[in-house]
Regions:
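Catalytic core of non-heme Fe(II) oxygenases with the double-stranded beta-helix
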Residues: 76-136
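Conserved double-stranded beta-helix
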Residues: 1-12, 107, 130-135
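Non-heme Fe(II)/2-oxoglutarate
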Residues: 2-5, 11-97
Length: 136
């Protein structure tokens, strides 16, 4: 599903980037998976409107779906393609690869959000590893 070869080649870059570890990569999803997810993007009725004041990390208003995915990897309002993607992000394969690339002690995906940034928002697709590390 993901281009792990590309990810693995960026491990050193991730670990050494300043002022914090990060990487930016294009085309990380296999094209057929991307096309299916793109074509099955949730429609307006699936989103709740988030006002700028509600989410400090959004530049502008955005719409989002989010769920606690620790115990349930299924969003009834999403397509099979999106549910398969969420399940993959919760899989041992994904977590193990992400742990190997980042060097972080990642244990599980605890939350999943689909954010549809509206005009003026600047958030791009990303993984917040802090949300995936086990609480101490």
């Amino acid at each position: 599903m993901l281009n792990w070869e590309m990810y693995n080649s960026k491990s050193s870059e991730f670990r050494n980037n300043k002022p914090f570890p990060h990487i930016f990569m294009k085309n990380i999803l296999n094209q057929d998976i991307y096309d299916q997810l793109y074509n099955e993007w949730p429609n307006d009725e699936h989103f709740k409107l988030v006002k700028q004041t509600m989410k400090r990390y959004h530049h502008g208003p955005s719409r989002y779906l989010d769920e606690d995915v620790q115990n349930n990897h299924h969003f009834p309002e999403l397509s099979d393609a999106w549910n398969n993607f969420v399940s993959y992000l919760c899989s041992d394969e994904y977590i193990t690869n992400l742990k190997n690339i980042t060097g972080l002690e990642i244990t599980k995906l605890t939350e999943f959000s689909i954010v549809d940034g509206l005009k003026g928002d600047y958030i791009h697709p990303h993984v917040d590893t802090s949300a995936m590390q086990e609480d101490n």
